[in-house]
């Protein structure tokens, strides 16, 4: 069973002035939650094959027992962005976002992300007016820092496993299964992109070329540790 919600609030302002200037300013607020839980029962000994309700079973399967899992992820973010166009020739945009997620360590849950880009419509320049066969010639470039969450909900918390087969005075025991990591932080990727767009002969011929590079920092991966550490990974 799962339940989730994603709420967003957007404020925006745009204006054209002096016939050549276009400005857009936006502010976005977002909050989301994903909650899920599941239970598993393995039983046997039903009186008839068409009676499958759990309470009608005779017993649990051999070495079987009820199992279950649950997860809760929460995320919040605020984004501001500005776009500017001059005379439909020059473009610029800037965005900044502060993001927070519950999966990370208590001291690393929030992180900033940002991007900026520029563009140039060369075919709009006066020196291109006599090039009649060319409909579009645009150069663009951008840089961005993005983040991702690619692990379980409780990866940064200390986890315990219960002993259910052995008891002491009717009480369960437990042992530490995973260490807490309050410094578990966002995996960030630096992205560079440079592009060229060409349209010719009434846009019968179109060419788009991109050169890009992505570099990920603080890459998260699973490691298997020696048993002498007391933890498998």
Indicate where each model-derived feature is located:
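Extracellular/periplasmic, surface-exposed regions of secreted and cell-surface proteins
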Residues: 1-233
